Structures are given as C-alpha cells and as structure tokens.
C-alpha cells in the first residue's frame, strides 16, 4: 500500500524520516507542563491553575504570507518558522498573556526531510524565543496542490493571563504616551508590495548586494520577525501598561485604533525613531505615498506600548535594560478614533 501511495506522490517513509529529524528540535522547546511526546493523536498540556485567580486562555493563529516566495527563491528555510511563531505569539502577548504552547501546519508538494527539518528548526527557535512549547503539528504532503518546491505554513498558539491582568486598552486616556520597540525589518507583512516594487518593477535580484542595506536584498527581506514576548512580560511584572499594539498588516494606521477607546486618537511623531533603510528603499523605488507606507508597513516599529506619562521614563529604562531599542514616538489625545501623523507632509 505504501509503495502504491508513493507512486501517487505521497512518500510515507520520507515523512517518517522528517519526523525523526525534527524530534530533537521540538523536544528542546518542551516546558514541564507538556505531558506527551511526539506521535500522539492529541497533545496534552497540564495548566497549573493555582497560579491564577481566574485564568483566561488567549488564542491566536496566523501565517507568513508571500514572504514564503522569498524563502523559495533563496532556498533558505530555517528562519521562516520563526516568522510563523512570531506572528502568533506577538498577537497573544498584546492581551497580556503568556504563550504556553504552539502548533504548526505545514503543507508541501513533496516531503524532503532536510527541508522539513530546517523549517521545524525555525519554528522551534521561535518557540524558544517566546518561552512556549512546540506541542504538536501536521505535515501534509499534497502532490498537485503546490508548485514544485513550494509549501505553506500556518501556526496556532494558546496563552494564559489572569483576568485581572488582561490588557484591553479600555483605560487609555488623553496624555498617555506611546513607546515603540524597534523592528528587525519588514517582518511578515507587505511582501506582495515589496516584491512588486523591487523585483517585478525595478528588476532587482534577491542576490543583489544593496549598499544602503549592507547585505544582499534577499538576506534583508528574510530577516525574521522579532518576538517581543519575554521583554513585554518582564515589563508587565513591574509596570502598568494600558495597551499593546503589534504592528502587522495595516501598519500604524489600521492597528493602533484597535486598542483605542472611542474619543481617543494616537498622535505619532514621525522622525522620533529611525526608519529602517529597507522602507526608504521600497518607498523611493515605488514612489509610494506616506499614507500608503504607514498603512502597509511597520516602518521600523514592531510593537508599541501605551503607558501613563509618569511611567514613561521608568518603562523606557526597563526596556533598555532588557536590550530593547525603545523610542518615545507619540501620545494619546482626545479626538476621533484614528492615527494622526506629525512631522511629515501627508
């Protein structure tokens, strides 16, 4: 039966080899609460409810979009898994939750054990960076569904927060301060536009060395999404944070209002942090307007914290102790629930 299945395009033996290869990477992410090994039908996790008065589970799921196209073109697969984890756990920590475990879904045209191992190694690295366990996953070999050498990846995470410590943004008020944490680059959003402008329209190659970037274009674009979980949780232990914003698809313009109460707007002081060269390259090459840039990209800020003005200095100092590049980038004022930009001609 397995030989007939192999002739149909599904190689069970290759799948088994891939599982063996990934085991060492997966196991290094296991927290003490993990109760199962690889291979079970369902993964078990013992939540210590005694640590919480009213534990609330927080879930998130996401993928990495067309950044995958760059991994295919560069034949580099060991960091895209970090992106998959980052997109999920950064969303969960925004609620004040600690990510507990992560599951992945990987769909491929053909199982190549070495490639699967590289992808899962990246997922495990992302889990290690965020302190959550890679508790399970699915690798689906589906001949005829994907072009040769291509795959898709998605992730799912569950975290926990005590109800009294949930962060909702409900208390955000005029005078509060916005602190931005530096991104590592484009992260995992806006790549359809990046690819159109730089590759299709300008004819650049991913293997081109770009002086303003100091590296090959493909290396810059595949830089993994930063994971902010441990830093944010550390700040939450000692400081009140009214709201957190993960800058993903929709950029500043779409994401910041998601945490603002009615009657409050965010004022962003453009120029109060360094915009990364990759964004200047894309904007210049595509003649893209500032409104489009700030509605598409993170512009060098991957996570934002909203704090009381009297807490801003101590929060900044804490973040710097944790190795973060943190910037005071704006404030909250009364007005229509939206983002207002100072310092740039719109």
Swiss-Prot record:
Its main location: cytoplasm. It comes from the Bacteria. It catalyses: 2-formamido-N(1)-(5-O-phospho-beta-D-ribosyl)acetamidine + ATP = 5-amino-1-(5-phospho-beta-D-ribosyl)imidazole + ADP + phosphate + H(+). Its EC number is 6.3.3.1. GO terms for molecular function: ATP binding; phosphoribosylamine-glycine ligase activity; phosphoribosylformylglycinamidine cyclo-ligase activity. The keyword ATP-binding applies. Pathway: Purine metabolism; IMP biosynthesis via de novo pathway; 5-amino-1-(5-phospho-D-ribosyl)imidazole from N(2)-formyl-N(1)-(5-phospho-D-ribosyl)glycinamide: step 2/2. One of its GO terms (cellular component) is cytosol. It is found in: Cytoplasm. CDD domains: PurM (cd02196). InterPro entries: PurM-like_C_dom, PurM-like_C_sf, PurM-like_N, PurM-like_N_sf, PurM_cligase. Pfam families: AIRS, AIRS_C. It is an enzyme of class 6 (ligase). Keywords: ATP-binding, Cytoplasm, Ligase, Nucleotide-binding, Purine biosynthesis. GO terms for biological process: 'de novo' IMP biosynthetic process; adenine biosynthetic process. Belongs to the AIR synthase family. This is Phosphoribosylformylglycinamidine cyclo-ligase. The gene is purM.
């Amino acid at each position: 039966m397995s030989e007939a299945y192999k002739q149909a395009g599904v190689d069970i033996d290759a799948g088994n080899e891939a599982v063996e290869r990934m085991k060492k990477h997966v196991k290094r992410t296991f927290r003490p609460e993990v109760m199962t090994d690889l291979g079970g039908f369902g993964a078990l996790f013992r939540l210590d409810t005694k640590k919480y008065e009213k534990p609330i589970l927080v879930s998130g799921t996401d993928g990495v979009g067309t950044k995958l196209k760059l991994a295919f073109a560069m034949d580099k697969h060991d960091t895209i898994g970090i992106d998959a984890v980052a997109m999920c756990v950064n969303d969960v920590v925004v609620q004040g939750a600690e990510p507990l475990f992560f599951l992945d879904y990987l769909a491929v045209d053909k199982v190549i054990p070495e490639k699967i191992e590289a992808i899962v190694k990246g997922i495990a690295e992302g889990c290690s960076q965020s302190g959550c366990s890679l508790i399970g996953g699915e690798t689906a070999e589906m001949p005829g569904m994907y072009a040769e050498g291509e795959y898709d990846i998605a992730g799912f995470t569950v975290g926990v927060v005590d109800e009294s410590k949930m962060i909702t943004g409900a208390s955000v008020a005029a005078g509060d301060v916005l602190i931005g944490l530096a991104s590592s680059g484009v992260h995992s959003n806006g790549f359809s536009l990046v690819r159109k402008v730089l590759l299709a329209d300008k004819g650049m190659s991913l293997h081109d060395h770009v002086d303003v970037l100091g590296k090959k274009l493909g290396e810059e674009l595949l830089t993994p999404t930063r994971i902010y979980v441990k830093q944010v949780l550390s700040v939450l232990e000692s400081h009140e944070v009214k709201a957190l914003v993960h800058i993903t698809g929709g950029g500043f313009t779409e994401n910041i209002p998601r945490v603002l109460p009615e009657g409050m707007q965010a004022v962003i002081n453009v120029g109060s942090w360094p915009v990364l060269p990759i964004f200047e390259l894309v904007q210049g090459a595509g003649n893209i307007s500032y409104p489009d840039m700030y509605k598409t990209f993170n512009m060098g800020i991957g996570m934002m914290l909203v704090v009381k003005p009297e807490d801003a200095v101590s929060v900044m100092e804490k973040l710097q102790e944790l190795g973060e590049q943190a910037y005071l980038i704006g404030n909250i004022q009364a007005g229509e629930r939206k983002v207002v930009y100072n310092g740039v001609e719109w």
